[in-house]
C-alpha cells in the first residue's frame, strides 16, 4: 500500500493586489472628504463590495476619478447616476458579507468532523498494539490492519477536498496576527469578524492536517512492523521445528549408550573417539539454539512477546540442549577417567600392589597414598616400603657410614629389583619416553609409564617373573621420597635418571660416565654449575637415608672445587678428568663405589677363618690386618666394631671383596713385615683415609641447585642434626681429642681414622702369578723379584695418591681462613665485629657440646646393649658351647674349660675370652666416663636438656 501524502496548503496567504487597491481607494476617499461636493463624498464613502472575491471593481472609480479630474464638478444627471451605482454596490456588498458568513460556517463543521474521526482512528490504531507472538494471530492482525488502512485510504479524498476548501477560503480571506491582545468591544467591525473567522478556520485546518499526516505515517510504520514480526516468527517457528528434530535424533543416539561398567577396557579409546565425533556432528545445534534465542530477544525488544505455546517450546529446546551437552560432557569425562584409571597407562593396575586392609588411593596431583582401613590411618609410604625402612634400622650397628649407607642401598636395590636392570636397558626406556632433556619436569604418570616399561622389558630380557605392580609402586615411592619429599607430584628428568642409574646393576664407571653426559654440553665438557647440579642430585640418595652428614653434607660446592682441580685452571672439566677424580673416591661420592664393592662381595667366599668369630669360610668382605700376621676379620665383625685385644682398628687394614691371589698375599706379607717395625705413634701421626676427603667449609651454598620440594615440618630438625654432624666431623678432622680421651679406640673409630685399602681385581691382581701357591713362589726367585717389584710399584702409586691428598688438604685448609678474613673485612665497626665473633664462637661451642652430648648418649645406649648381650652370653650353660667354633661359644667358655679341651694352649688365655674381658672392662670404664661427662654437660647447659631429648626422640624415630 502506498502511503497517502497530503499537499501542504499555505494557511497564511499574502494579500492580493485587489485587496491593496481597495485600501488605496479607501485612503483616497478619506482625502477627498474635504471636497465641497457632497455627492462625490457620498460616492467615495460607500464603496461597492468586491465581486466574487476579486476585490472592488475599479472601473467605476476610475471613470469617476477621470470625469472629476477631466471636467471638474459633475453635472446633476451624472451625479444621480453615480449615486445610484453606489447604492447598488452597497447592496451587493451587504449580500457578499452575508454569503461570507454562511460559507465559513460550512467549513467549520467538516473540519471538526475530520478532527474527531482522525482522533478516533488513531486510538483504534494504538489499540492494535502490542502484537501477539504467534504466527496465526499476527496474520490475523495483518488482515485487520489492511482493512483499517483501506478505510483510512477511502476517507482521504474527502479530507483532501475539505482541506483544499479551507485553503481556498484562507487564500481569499487572509488574516493578520494579533500584535497585542485587547478586549473585544461589543460592536466589532466586519473586518475584525472576518479576521477571527479566518483564524479559527486556519487552526482547525492545521490540526486536521497534522492528525492526517500522523495517522498515515503510523499506518505505514505499523504495517512494516507487522510484516517484520511475521517474518521473525516464521523463522523462529521453522528453526524450532528443525532443532526439535535434531535433538530427537541426538537423544536417540544417547539412548543407545552402554553403561561404562559394561565396556571392555580395550574398547575405551574407540568409545572416546566416537563421543568426540558425536560432539562435533551436533555442534551446529549450538548456533541454531543461539539464533532462536537471539530472535526471541529481538522480538522482546520490539514489545512482541512469544505466546505461551511458543515460549514453552523454546524453553523445552533450551533445556533439552543443555541436558544433551551435559550428558555428552559427562560421558566423555567418564570414558576418559575410566581409560586413565583402567587403561594401559593408568594406575589402576597398581592397586594390586597392596593387600587387605590396605588400599591404594590417588591424590589430586596423581601422587599415590595408602589407606589402612583397619587402623583408619593414611600414609605416603607403601606398606612394603615401611617394612623395608624398618629392616634398614637393623644396619645402624654398622659403625662406618659409607658401608652403612651402601648396605642400606643394597637392600633397597634388591627390594626394587633394580639390581637386575642394566644401564643399557634403562637408556632404551629413557629414549623411548623422550627423556633426553634433563631439564624436563616429569609428573607421576610419566614416571609410572617409564617404570612400567622398564620392568616389562626386564621380564622379556631376563625371562623371569617380576611383580610389576609392586616393583613400580615401590620404585615410585622411593623416587618420591628421595627427590619429591613434599609430594608435589613433579620431579626433574635428571633426578629420575640419576636415581635409576645409581641403583641399576652396572659398573660404577659406566654409571658415572652416563651421569656426566647428562650435564655435559655438546663438547662433552661440564662447567661448575652443571656439575653442582649433578652432585646435588646424587647426594639426595644418602640424604634420604639420613647419612648425608658423613659425605660432606648438602653443600656440594667443596666437592665441585675439589673436582675442578683436575681441570688445570679451565672453567670446564672433561669426562676423563671427572672420572679420574671419582676414581679417588671423593667423600661425596664414595658411597657409590662402596655399593659396587658390596654387590660384588656378596657372592665371594674366602677360604680363611675370622680371627674374632671363627667363621670359616669368610663370606663377603675380608679384612686383613697389615700390622699382625695371619689376622683376618669377616665383614660382620669388622663393620660392627668387634675386635680382639691385639687387632685394633686404627692399624692399617686391607679390604678384599674378591678371592685373594698369591701376589696379593706376598704383597700384604711384605707390608705387614714393614709395619711391624713401626710404632703406634707413627700410625697416629700419619692418619690415612680410605677416600678422598673434601674440606667442608661453613659457607653459603652459592652453587645453583634445583629448587627442592616443600619439606615436612620435621625437615628443619633434620637439617639442624645434619648441620651439627657436619661441624662435629670438621672438629674431629682438626685433631679433636675429646673422643680419644673419653672413648677407647675401638669405640670412637670411624672410617676416616684408619687406613682401609681395598684390593681391586683389576688393578691389584697379577694374572701371570694369580694361580701359584705361596710355596711355589718362594722357590722361584725370579717370580719373587717380580712380585716385590709390583709391590713396590703399588706402594709408590699409593704414596703418590696420599701425597696428592695431603696437598689438597693443605690448600683447602688455607682457603678456609681466607673466607673468614673476607667476611671480617666487610665489617665497618671493629667493636661490633668482635662482639659478633665472640657470640659466634660461643654459639659454635654450645652447638659442639650439644652434638657431643647427643652422640655420647647414643654411644652409651650402644654400650649398654653390648654389655647386656655379653651378660647373656656369659650366663649360658657350658654344655651349649662344647665343640663350637662360633663367637658365642667362645665367649661362653671359661678359661678352665679352654684348658681342658685344648691342652696345647695350657697357660695361655684364649683370644676370645681375652677379648670378652677386654670389652667388658673397657665398657665399664667408658660408661663411667660417659656418666661423668654427661653430668658435667647437664650442669653446664641445663637449658638445652629439653631440646636434646626432643632431638634424640627424632633420631630414634
Curated annotation (Swiss-Prot):
GO terms for cellular component: dendrite; glutamatergic synapse; perikaryon; plasma membrane; postsynaptic density. Keywords: Cell membrane, Cell projection, Membrane, Metal-binding, Phosphoprotein, Repeat, Synapse, Zinc, Zinc-finger. Residues 358-383 form the WW domain. The keyword Metal-binding applies. Its main location: other. One of its GO terms (molecular function) is zinc ion binding. The keyword Zinc-finger applies. Residues 877-923 are annotated as: Disordered. SMART domains: SPEC (SM00150), WW (SM00456), ZnF_ZZ (SM00291). Spectrin repeats lie at residues 102-179, 231-337. It is found in: Postsynaptic density; Cell projection, Dendrite; Perikaryon; Cell membrane. Zn(2+) binds at residues 610, 613, 634, 637. It holds the Pfam family EF-hand_3. A zinc finger (ZZ-type) spans 605-661. The modification Phosphothreonine is found at residue 910. Detected in fetal brain. The modification Phosphoserine is found at residue 748. It is a peripheral membrane protein. GO terms for biological process: central nervous system development; synapse organization; synaptic signaling. Residues 877-900 have a biased composition (Low complexity). Required for normal myelination and for normal organization of the cytoplasm and the formation of Cajal bands in myelinating Schwann cells. Required for normal PRX location at appositions between the abaxonal surface of the myelin sheath and the Schwann cell plasma membrane. Possibly involved in membrane-cytoskeleton interactions of the central nervous system. Interacts with PRX; this enhances phosphorylation. Identified in a dystroglycan complex that contains at least PRX, DRP2, UTRN, DMD and DAG1. PANTHER family: DYSTROPHIN-RELATED PROTEIN 2, E3 UBIQUITIN-PROTEIN LIGASE KCMF1. This is Dystrophin-related protein 2. The lineage of its organism: Eukaryota, Metazoa, Chordata, Craniata, Vertebrata. The gene is DRP2.
